[in-house]
Amino acid sequence: MTGSAADTHRCPHPKITKGTRSRSSHARPVSLATSGGSEEEDKDGGVLFHVNKSGFPIDSHTWERMWLHVAKVHPRGGEMVGAIRNAAFLAKPSIPQVPNYRLSMTIPDWLQAIQNYMKTLQYNHTGTQFFEIRKMRPLSGLMETAKEMTRESLPIKCLEAVILGIYLTNGQPSIERFPISFKTYFSGNYFHHVVLGIYCNGYYGSLGMSRRAELMDKPLTFRTLSDLVFDFEDSYKKYLHTVKKVKIGLYVPHEPHSFQPIEWKQLVLNVSKMLRADIRKELEKYARDMRMKILKPASAHSPTQVRSRGKSLSPRRRQASPPRRLGRRDKSPALTEKKVADLGTLNEVGYQIRI
């Protein structure tokens, strides 16, 4: 998960000293001024975390802000920070080798190799997300960020793991990838988490990173998408989290140079207000439509359409009218009315003319 109030006093990630590779000449004071950069801050579960927007090498402001946060949340605080930053010698951090696919490998073995690589990078407990992920950025740009992850070999969080998983599974057309997002509630706070759903040869699984082993990767053993989602929901219950919403995106194309952004939430289910039978029904309809490649990104410049509850989008049930692109579908009890896109700026081939 991207944040947890119960985990704010965990020991920082042992790879925290990796920052010295990028900026070895940083000053080492423990007492620092606060950031105040609200555009580089976010909250999840009531816990503040920062995002490195300076790239690499990390600039001094981001570097000092990270250490200040660690000093606040670590049980030993400034003592631990000072011991690391003022040490005369620090062991050189290991750089894991990026996995390479071999023809002798099965798909489950390949996915396990990717997940093991992510685990070697380890989960980022520093309170600073090292790689900025803008969800609406084109896929080609996000793949460049994934390359940077392999070069820097720094700890990552769940959103970074999704992008890295897409990058490492590119070129395997038998593997379909799509994001699965969760919004949960615990102890008065809301939490957000995302994993990379996997579909291959009739089975579902996932790749990802989390503080909790049960909330990241899942093997390719689930016959249906609903079985996979329910397994995550059951895992959340072990930590007393109530799943409020589940968002499913579209398949991510195996085209690393695509300018199309990832569709993160084509289907939105307000699961806390639905029966499991209804959740399963909606998920299986959606999974069938994804497999048949009927669904289209809501970001396309064309009229949008919301599927009504219980209505299929399979070819045998579609009307004879010309096909229309589908918009994001929200399965909450109250559906807000979608506005039809303005076609005044579209030319004859469907491209929008920017003025």
UniProtKB/Swiss-Prot annotation:
Biological processes, Gene Ontology terms: axon development; cell-cell fusion; labyrinthine layer blood vessel development; labyrinthine layer development; placenta blood vessel development; positive regulation of angiogenesis; positive regulation of endothelial cell proliferation; proteolysis
Catalytic residues in the record: 158, 193, 210
Entry EC no(s): 3.4.17.17
GO cellular component terms attached to this protein's record: cytoplasm; cytoskeleton; cytosol; extracellular region
Modified residue annotations for Phosphoserine: 302
Entries under InterPro entries matching the protein: VASH1
Tissue distribution: Preferentially expressed in bone marrow-derived mononuclear cells at the sprouting front.
Coiled coil (residue ranges): none
The entry's keywords: Carboxypeptidase, Cytoplasm, Cytoskeleton, Hydrolase, Phosphoprotein, Protease, Secreted
Effect of mutating residue 135 to E: Strongly reduced tyrosine carboxypeptidase activity
Effect of residue 134 to E: Slightly reduced tyrosine carboxypeptidase activity
Impact upon substituting residue 218 to E: Strongly reduced tyrosine carboxypeptidase activity
Cited Pfam families: Vasohibin
Keyword Hydrolase in annotation: yes
Intracellular or extracellular location(s): Cytoplasm; Secreted; Cytoplasm, Cytoskeleton
Family, per entry: Belongs to the transglutaminase-like superfamily. Vasohibin family.
Function: Tyrosine carboxypeptidase that removes the C-terminal tyrosine residue of alpha-tubulin, thereby regulating microtubule dynamics and function. Acts as an activator of angiogenesis: expressed in infiltrating mononuclear cells in the sprouting front to promote angiogenesis. Plays a role in axon formation.
Descriptive protein name: Tubulinyl-Tyr carboxypeptidase 2
